[in-house]
């Protein structure tokens, strides 16, 4: 996630701050209903109650998940201590895996230093707002999911109209599936992504803003 100047006038603009930096997409300010309704299939209790959240300023989010190519360049230049494994699935344009929350934060700080722009992890609210891209369904592409839409555990069906699909059991290169309405790829599937927030089971009962809770236990989201 990168801060966008307040005078930005073209939400959706795609840019890259440096040849080694991720390609970014501007996301406009707005508001949305965060969380999932109580009757949504396969939801977790911590996804509710739904509540309206305002995103007060535009920001930018990576067009794709950070790739091994991008993270390996960071490793060569900054040496964070260890080189994350690719689980023998390949590196290159696949999303980087086996990185901790702290690794991700250090990478963002390095990007900030090298590019002169502010990078950080998105809050959970910013991430969900960007993922939904104006939709209210379980997925930004509708009520169900298939392996033609995302790389996920396709050996189970989702929703009334869902079907058993392909389960690839490994990551694939980024950008292999259709983007959402904001031009972001792989917002569902392929890898889990880190957010700035700490995990808190009853967070939705306590908080209703965009700012991260930095008190609870660290957990991927």
Residue ranges and their predicted role:
Residues 7, 56-58, 213, 218:
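Compositionally biased, intrinsically disordered low-complexity segments
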Residues 11, 23, 28, 49, ...:
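Cysteine-rich, disulfide-stabilized extracellular repeat modules
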Residues 14-82, 99-102, 188-189, 196:
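A short glycine-rich, aromatic-capped structural motif
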Residues 2-4, 24, 119:
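Short glycine-aromatic motifs
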Residues 33, 37-43, 81, 85-221:
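Functional-site microenvironments in short loops/helix caps that host divalent-cation chemistry
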Residues 4-6, 60-64, 97, 142:
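Alpha-helical interaction segments
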């Amino acid at each position: 996630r990168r801060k966008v100047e307040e005078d930005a006038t073209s939400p959706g603009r795609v840019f890259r701050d440096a040849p080694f930096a991720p390609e970014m997409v501007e996301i406009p300010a707005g508001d949305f209903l965060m969380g999932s309704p109580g009757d949504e299939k396969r939801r977790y209790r911590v996804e509710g109650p739904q509540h309206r959240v305002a995103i007060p300023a535009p920001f930018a989010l990576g067009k794709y998940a950070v790739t091994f190519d991008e993270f390996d360049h960071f490793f060569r230049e900054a040496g964070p201590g260890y080189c994350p494994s690719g689980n023998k699935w390949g590196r290159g344009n696949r999303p980087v895996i086996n990185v901790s929350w702290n690794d991700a934060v250090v990478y963002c700080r390095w990007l900030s230093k090298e590019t002169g722009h502010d990078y950080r992890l998105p809050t959970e609210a910013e991430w969900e707002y960007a993922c939904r891209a104006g939709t209210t369904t379980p997925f930004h592409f509708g009520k169900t999911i298939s392996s033609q839409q995302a790389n996920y555990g396709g050996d189970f069906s989702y929703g009334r109209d869902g079907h058993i699909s392909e389960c690839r059991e490994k990551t694939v290169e980024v950008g292999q599936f259709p983007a959402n309405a904001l031009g972001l790829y792989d917002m569902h599937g392929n890898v889990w992504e880190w957010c700035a927030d700490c995990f808190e089971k009853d967070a939705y009962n306590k908080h209703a803003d965009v700012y991260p809770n930095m008190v609870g236990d660290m957990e991927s989201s």
